[in-house]
Amino acid sequence: MPGLPEVAPGDDLAKLIAAVEPGLVDGDVLLVTSKIVSKAEGRIVRADDREAAIDAETVRVVARRGALRIVENRQGLVMAAAGVDASNTPSGTVLLLPEDPDASARAIRDGLRDTLGVDVGVVVTDTFGRPWRTGLTDVAIGAAGVRVLDDLRGGTDAYGNPLSATVVATADELAAAGDLVKGKAAGLPVAVVRGLPHVIAGDDEAGARAMVRGGRDDMFRLGTSEAVREAVTQRRTVRAFTDEPVDPGAVRRAVAAAVTAPAPHHTTPWRFVLLESAESRTRLLDAMRDAWIADLRGDRKTEESIAKRVRRGDVLRNAPYLVVPCMVMDGSHSYGDARRDAAEREMFVVATGAGVQNFLVALAGERLGSAWVSSTMFCRDVVRRALGLPESWEPMGAVAVGHAAEEPRDRPARDAGAFIEVR
C-alpha cells in the first residue's frame, strides 16, 4: 500500500490508511508493521535510554550473549532486546513495541469500519529471529478480526490419517507473506492480503496473544547456558508427592548424571539402590522404624514423643519411589595413622555427597521432586539386612522421589558474599 506519509505521535492510522484510497473490500486483511503503530502511539525514546528501555520492557531474560539479550516482554513475546529497535526511526531515537498490539489492531479495524464501512482483518507484525534457523521473518504480535490459529486437530489428512497435533499459525503465515512485499527498507509499512475470506473473524475472536505459548508448555524456556545454570538452583526439597508413577528411565538417567561427580583415586564410590517395588520400600521402612523406636526408647523418650518423631519419616513412606545412595571405599588408601586415614574417608564422603547432589539436580531436570533424608545413616546394619546389601556398602541417607504435589515456590537468590572469604 504505497502513499502513506511519515507517521507521527498522535496520528490516527485508520484515517491515514483510508486517505490513500486503498480500495479495501470486505474480507481483506491488512498487515501493518509495528513500527508505524509505535510511532502513532508515541512509543519513542532517546537512543541513549535504550538499555533502560529494554530493562523496563523485560519480564525475564531467556538468553544473554555479550551485549545481546533475548528476553520475554510484558506481552509474553520472546525476542531480541524486548523489541526495542533503532531501525526505521530518526537518528538518536529507538522505538518500543506497542503497549498492547491486539488493542492497536482493534483500533485500526474499528477505525476503518467507521471510515470506509468495510469489514477487514488487521495483523500487526514485527520481525523475529528464530531458534535453529538463520534469518529473520515477520510474525504477528497483534491481531483483530482474524482467526490467528487454525486448529485442525480431530480431522484427517488426504490419506485419512488422524491429525492430532496440527494447529496452523495463520496470523504468522499472513505476516510472513506480507513481508515479501513490504520489505525492510522499501517504505511500505502496510500490505493487503485479498482472497482469504475464511480467515476473517468477528470482534470476539482472540488476538495474537493467544499464540503465545505459556511457560508450563514451553520446552525451550531458556537458552542453553541459562538452562544449565538454572538447573542447579531448580532443585528443591519436596515432601509431598502425587500418586503419579515415577518413570524408572528418568531415575536411571539421573544416576548416569550422578556418577559423573569427582571422586578420589579414579574410583567410583557410588552405588544407588533403586526401591521400585512397594514390598521393598515397606520392608526397609518398617525395619528402620523399629530401629528408630528402639533408639528413642533407649533415650528414655515418652511414647508420645516417639510417635511424633517417627511421623517425620512419612516423607519416605508416602513417596512413590525411593533410592538409597551408598558409599563404597573400594580403591581407598590405608596410611596406618588416624589423621590420614580420617582424611581418606572424608574424601570418599565428599565424593559421595557430590554424586548425591548431581542425582538430585538431575531429578529436577527430569521434572521430578526429591527429598534427601539422612535416616539410613543411623541404622546401616538394619538397611543392609533389609535390602541384602554387602557389608562394604555404607548407606548415605535415602532419597524420596516423585512428582511434586504442588509447584515449589521460587527461592530468592542468596548473597554469595556472606559465604566468601578472599585472601
UniProtKB/Swiss-Prot annotation:
Pathway: Cofactor biosynthesis; coenzyme F420 biosynthesis. The keyword Ribosomal protein does not apply. Binds 2 divalent metal cations per subunit. The ions could be magnesium and/or manganese. The keyword Metal-binding applies. It comes from the Bacteria. One of its GO terms (biological process) is F420-0 metabolic process. The lineage of its organism: Bacteria, Bacillati, Actinomycetota, Actinomycetes, Kitasatosporales. Residues 1-223 are annotated as: Coenzyme F420:L-glutamate ligase. Keywords: GTP-binding, Ligase, Magnesium, Manganese, Metal-binding, Multifunctional enzyme, Nucleotide-binding, Oxidoreductase, Potassium. It catalyses: oxidized coenzyme F420-0 + GTP + L-glutamate = oxidized coenzyme F420-1 + GDP + phosphate + H(+); oxidized coenzyme F420-0 + FMN + H(+) = dehydro coenzyme F420-0 + FMNH2; oxidized coenzyme F420-1 + GTP + L-glutamate = oxidized coenzyme F420-2 + GDP + phosphate + H(+). Its EC number is 6.3.2.31, 6.3.2.34, 1.3.8.17. A divalent metal cation 2 binds at T127. This is Bifunctional F420 biosynthesis protein FbiB. Transmembrane segments: none annotated. Pfam families: F420_ligase (PF01996), Nitroreductase (PF00881). FMN binds at A263, S374, R411. Coenzyme F420-(gamma-Glu)n binds at D295. Disulfide bonds: none annotated. In the N-terminal section; belongs to the CofE family. Residues 224-423 are annotated as: Dehydro-coenzyme F420-0 reductase. Bifunctional enzyme that catalyzes the GTP-dependent successive addition of two or more gamma-linked L-glutamates to the L-lactyl phosphodiester of 7,8-didemethyl-8-hydroxy-5-deazariboflavin (F420-0) to form polyglutamated F420 derivatives, and the FMNH2-dependent reduction of dehydro-F420-0 to form F420-0. Its cofactor is Mg(2+); Mn(2+); K(+). A divalent metal cation 1 binds at D85, D126.
